């Protein structure tokens, strides 16, 4: 695996774009200084594997920029995308060395990594880190439960609208923007990846995206740039209430 190490001096914690949402969100300046001593950066190209299922992972990390997918493979070779890692999401399990899924960069990916052992030691000494990680874990559990509803009960149109709403709200939160006005973002998944993630066919995804565009729910510039002029209407199409369903 070819990695491009990013000099730490280019990425001070206080200037980090995910500072207000990542595992370090509650840390004070002294705690951030401690984190600075154990962190390093790794970048991956789109399509590159970050780690394979079953491998030992000697680090934990936060996604700084880019998108990654979590995928599990069945014994007969069938694969299922089981999650997305968006900016500020945490990957790795303190106290557990192996991972249960493949992590693959969907776009060019930059990760802020912490060596596992020093990070685990810091969690013992710095309650803010452990508290924030617990909060993020509970949010992820809530999201998983909502996703069960989406996959089990929602129509194809509602599934597409729900995924767009999740990405739009996360993008707005990272940019510290309100989600009650026009929203624009780049869709991080191809149509094929959306189909895999949502349990739909490629043809169904393409048809439903086109229908949402035709009905004025979204606008598209190229294949990836999405414009949502009325977020409340998108939520209606998703079958969600005003909080957008899944945590951001």
From Swiss-Prot:
Kindly give the CDD domains that the UniProt entry links to this protein. Answer: CAP_ED (cd00038), HTH_CRP (cd00092)
Asked if the keyword Protease belongs to this entry, the reply reads no
Entry keywords, A to Z: Activator, DNA-binding, Iron, Transcription, Transcription regulation
Q: Which Gene3D superfamilies match?
A: Jelly Rolls, Winged helix-like DNA-binding domain superfamily/Winged helix DNA-binding domain
- Please indicate which superkingdom the organism of origin belongs to: Bacteria
Record Pfam families: cNMP_binding (PF00027), HTH_Crp_2 (PF13545)
Any one GO MF term held by the record is: DNA binding
Query: What else does the entry mention about this protein?
Result: Possesses 4 cysteines which may bind a metal ion (possibly iron).
- What is the designated name of this protein? Transcriptional activator protein FnrL
Q: Provide the species name.
A: Cereibacter sphaeroides (strain ATCC 17023 / DSM 158 / JCM 6121 / CCUG 31486 / LMG 2827 / NBRC 12203 / NCIMB 8253 / ATH 2.4.1.) (Rhodobacter sphaeroides)
